[in-house]
Amino acid sequence: MENGNGKMEFCMKDPLNWGMAAESMKGSHLDEVKKMVAEFRKPVVQLAGKTLTIAQVAAIAARDDGVTVELAEAAREGVKASSDWVMESMNKGTDSYGVTTGFGATSHRRTKQGGALQKELIRFLNAGIFGNGTETSHTLPHSATRAAMLVRINTLLQGYSGIRFEILEAITKFLNTNITPCLPLRGTITASGDLVPLSYIAGLLTGRPNSKAVGPTGEKLNAEEAFRLAGISSGFFELQPKEGLALVNGTAVGSGMASMVLYEANILGVMSEVLSAVFAEVMNGKPEFTDHLTHKLKHHPGQIEAAAIMEHILDGSGYVKAAELLHEMDPLQKPKQDRYALRTSPQWLGPQIEVIRSATKMIEREINSVNDNPLIDVSRNKALHGGNFQGTPIGVAMDNTRLAIAAIGKLLFAQFSELVNDYYNNGLPSNLTGSRDPSLDYGFKGAEIAMASYCSELQFLANPVTNHVQSAEQHNQDVNSLGLISSRKTSEAVEILKLMSSSFLVALCQAVDLRHIEENVRLAVKKTVSQVAKKTLNIGVDGVLHPSRFSEKELLRVVDREYVFAYADDPCSATYPLMQKLREVLVSHALANSGNEKDASTSIFHKIGVFEEELKGILPKEVENARASVENGTPAIPNKIEECRSYPLYKFVRGELGTELLTGEKVRSPGEELDQVFNALCEGKLVDPLLACLEAWNGAPLPIC
């Protein structure tokens, strides 16, 4: 913190920063995500060195022309003071690392040519490989480069690095005009900082002939063209002593990419909670798994919040009410509990949310840190030689985040597998097939195979990076963080989790529509069975009330019990359970009516054939009419999802994106629908409908009563 004179004053009430770390974790994760989204959408990022957020980094990275960077003018004095100190120190003959000495393991060398030393630093660090770009790109994505530029400016603004303010202004102009230096994808161990990639930013600033940049429309630029388009009229910079080191000796590339990754990971964490609740809805799950007492007794805040969010989605849901009625029928013949992928989803997701949230705070501390060497302490008139360039917080945070992402993906895969499996999904068709003829529709079978592939790759990526450290630079950099490598692997993991989340969301929407068809077809079948029963079973041939009339209620209970999609493609087939169970009811009544069975006028056995023939003449047509009414938008029963808190997600996928029920009768493939949802997720279009599902949540679980 700063005192009234603008000098840094470190808080002695919390000298170890644990209090600040704990304070930053107050409040719900959802509120934090909402705050991130709001920050991401702001048009200006104001840099002062100490208040940068991962959302702001993600915004600069992703929104090429929608956001502007502004530097705090108040920082100019401190930046200038450290720059002046370096020049004065060198003029006095003070020996300082990287100013009068060589670098790393060769720091025993000495020189008085400070400017030439910085020039050589940039030259020898330009050791990256880009390739010809025809097959595989070895260039860091320009979004990650923009993130690195922003984070490096933020560090250097704090006035401990010995660099001119004008250089920071030049990098800012590159950002604001969408001029992006080309950095190599690989070649850094993030200790001593991200030396190799950051040297290419310095190379552009100094006009090195090998430096390249990309313009606003993707055009390739040399240094001269980049300066002209950015409006930097001062010409290429001749680096002063320490300035090259200030530019390259930092963790900005690793922490910049980590910020981008964590912005998405936090949103995907919330999405996994909502998708798990929708999964419970379409699976006819029992909602008691979200009861607050269960989770309060476990104590973990991530679990408690995950359960409370799911509880909020399920509270008042029409699916939950229907499921309660379903579970009341024949309760002893059904599992008492749902499977783990549903029932323990809060316990599974909670720790992952905690890990992602903790990693977010760790990276936010890193992007607001001073992480080069040496540090210039003007107030004490000294250069401090330390190791803040060691990016261990990045490597550790990213390894942990990747584990959490893999765990979330594993849960989504388990849920997806249950959803498409008719042994487990409580009446939905196998593979979620939507056609009238399931023998010519295999629904989401291909998507399930793809999900297995995604999940396998994601589990492999969960392996840690930070235990693969190699001693580098003549054993001077004998331990190093591998921060950027871990960030890159976590970025890959996030992409795969987005593939899985998109696939699962489309499958859930398919399940919602199938439940809607199921409900309308069941109603049509009940009406038809009731109508046929009254016509054929109530009155005997002599006009007298027939004993079989008492079977109607049991016949309707059969319709309630039987899974619609077990017979819907051929409702009167003798090999399907509906007709078999209806016949069983009539046979049992006939057996109980044994005394009257010899008389044709009172025999129930004689009525069975009449009932079945009448049903065969009407039922297939009524089932088709019910299905057609759903497809035409005129169903007898509206879609339950419209009254549910999860509706905004469904509405977006079906309404905004224009997707529809997938069937083998149509040409459209699952991949076409999945692509639409995936692209929308990547573009951030799913954020608003996702948060709309939780708009009414007050941040607390339902009371225990």
UniProtKB/Swiss-Prot annotation:
Pathway: Phenylpropanoid metabolism; trans-cinnamate biosynthesis; trans-cinnamate from L-phenylalanine: step 1/1. Its EC number is 4.3.1.24. There is a cross-link at A191-G193 (5-imidazolinone (Ala-Gly)). Expressed mainly in roots. The modification 2,3-didehydroalanine (Ser) is found at S192. One of its GO terms (cellular component) is cytoplasm. One of its GO terms (molecular function) is phenylalanine ammonia-lyase activity. (E)-cinnamate binds at N249, Q337, R343, N373, K445, E473, N476. Contains an active site 4-methylidene-imidazol-5-one (MIO), which is formed autocatalytically by cyclization and dehydration of residues Ala-Ser-Gly. Keywords: Cytoplasm, Lyase, Phenylalanine catabolism, Phenylpropanoid metabolism. It holds the Pfam family Lyase_aromatic. It is found in: Cytoplasm. It is an enzyme of class 4 (lyase). The keyword Lyase applies. The keyword Magnesium does not apply. The active site is at Y97 (proton donor/acceptor). It catalyses: L-phenylalanine = (E)-cinnamate + NH4(+). CDD domains: PAL-HAL (cd00332). One of its GO terms (biological process) is L-phenylalanine catabolic process. This is a key enzyme of plant metabolism catalyzing the first reaction in the biosynthesis from L-phenylalanine of a wide variety of natural products based on the phenylpropane skeleton. Belongs to the PAL/histidase family. Homotetramer. This is Phenylalanine ammonia-lyase 2. The lineage of its organism: Eukaryota, Viridiplantae, Streptophyta, Embryophyta, Tracheophyta.
